[in-house]
């Protein structure tokens, strides 16, 4: 049984012209001199490509050719721009009425709801989407929203859910994302109706999910190619979808939310005022907030790395970041980070790992991943690794796991590799 992830909704009509891309082509039978010629067609020295017999026809013909060529080029550029303007990849500033209607005046069943956002699943312009309603951290006008959308919607990665566009009304923004069929990672690890069951019951599915998330976050931080480095600011197991397909993969939800809601603006760096401390409480999620984020409320790449470290420990242990147990009539907080630190320091990683994996995993790789998670959770943000390095490290451990799985392939799936007591 699948249980799905969280989201929000709203609109304004206006399509944004994307950046122009080049189209180039050449015929296979062209000589090298012809290819050099084609590169200089629009050069001020255009006469260099004309043969001696053509040159004899005079400069008037050459000028006529250049003028016609220029007109043709302008016409082609205009046609391409019009075509691109209609492509589905374009970000949309939806009209608020569209979202209001699609969500049945916001009376439709909520897809999910948290203290900071509400989400609906609906159909807009024939597309199955999730609309997320969030409050702005600061006022933003339509022009600025369009400019930010234009940048974010040009990002594409298999480990990110696609942002289609947005709308705004009052102090709220409504973000429209593609709907992805699957379940959030938290529910995959701990099914609310059956905590002893997990769809991620084998080692390769776990490390695949970890690799997908790491690569997606690395893309957000370092590889969008848009001359801007983004911060996610909402990394947690409930914001990651495990797709329902032949192979289990992970997609990070909410990319662009922090940027579009003004959560990453430097102008929002808090003082010692009371309002800033309230922002930390509302915008952060307990168990995923780095120490510096808890004290300042300012999101950074390093606070994202910290949150990823928590998610990695969840994947390995199957446990929640924070939970409470009763002890002598009092509630005692149990921290996954503290339990992991004890296990790593005492050499007890195998006892700490999720029992539902039945010890069928490469212990050395599991310990390396646990230590990597703790590196991401260093209290000093400067000592935390960059996501590019983390993603590369997990990719190598994934390959090691593949080799281990191939060697152990002849064993039954419920065979326990280690016979030693936990």
Residue ranges: model-predicted function:
Residues 1-93, 104, 119, 128-140, ...:
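Intrinsically disordered, low-complexity cytosolic regulatory tails
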Residues 180-196, 320, 348:
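Structural motif in protein kinase domains
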Residues 236-287:
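Activation segment/activation loop of eukaryotic-type protein kinase catalytic domains
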Residues 216-230:
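Protein kinase catalytic-loop region centered on the HRD/HxD motif
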Residues 304:
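Conserved catalytic-loop aspartate of Hanks-type protein kinases
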């Amino acid at each position: 049984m699948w249980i799905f992830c969280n989201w929000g909704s709203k609109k304004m009509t206006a399509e944004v012209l994307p950046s122009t891309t080049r189209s180039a082509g050449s015929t296979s039978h062209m000589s090298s001199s012809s290819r050099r010629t084609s590169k200089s067609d629009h050069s001020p020295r255009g006469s260099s490509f004309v043969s001696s017999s053509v040159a004899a026809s005079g400069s008037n013909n050459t000028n006529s050719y250049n003028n016609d060529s220029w007109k043709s080029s302008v016409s082609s550029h205009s046609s391409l721009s019009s075509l691109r303007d209609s492509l589905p990849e374009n970000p949309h500033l939806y009209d608020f009425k569209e979202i209001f209607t699609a969500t049945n005046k916001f009376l439709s069943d909520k897809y999910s709801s948290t203290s900071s956002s509400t989400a609906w699943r609906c159909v807009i312009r024939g597309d199955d989407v999730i609309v997320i309603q969030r409050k702005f951290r600061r006022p933003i006008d339509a022009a600025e929203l369009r400019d930010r959308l234009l940048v974010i919607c040009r990002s594409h990665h298999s480990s990110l859910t696609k942002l289609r566009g947005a709308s705004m009304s009052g102090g709220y923004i409504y973000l429209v994302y593609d709907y992805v069929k699957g379940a959030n990672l938290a529910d995959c690890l701990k099914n609310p109706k059956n905590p002893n069951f997990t769809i991620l019951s084998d080692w390769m599915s776990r490390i695949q999910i970890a690799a997908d998330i790491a690569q997606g976050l690395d893309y957000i931080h370092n590889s969008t190619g848009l001359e801007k480095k983004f911060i996610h600011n909402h990394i947690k197991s409930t914001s990651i979808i495990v797709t329902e397909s032949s192979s289990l993969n992970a997609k990070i939800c909410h990319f662009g939310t922090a940027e579009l809601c003004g959560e990453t603006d430097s102008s929002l760096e808090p003082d010692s005022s009371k309002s800033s401390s309230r922002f930390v409480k509302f915008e952060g999620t307990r168990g995923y907030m780095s120490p510096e984020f808890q004290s300042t409320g300012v999101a950074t790449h390093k606070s994202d790395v910290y949150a990823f470290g928590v998610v990695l420990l969840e994947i390995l242990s199957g446990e929640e970041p924070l939970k409470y147990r009763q002890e002598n009539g009092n509630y005692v907080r149990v921290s996954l980070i503290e339990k992991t630190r004890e296990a790593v320091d005492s050499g007890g990683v195998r006892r700490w790992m999720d029992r539902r994996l039945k010890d069928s995993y490469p212990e050395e790789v599991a310990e390396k991943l646990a230590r990597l998670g703790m590196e991401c959770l260093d209290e000093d943000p400067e000592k935390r690794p960059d996501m590019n390095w983390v993603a590369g490290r997990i990719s190598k451990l994934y390959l090691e796991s593949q080799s281990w799985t191939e060697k152990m392939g002849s064993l039954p799936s419920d065979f326990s590799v280690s016979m030693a007591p936990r």
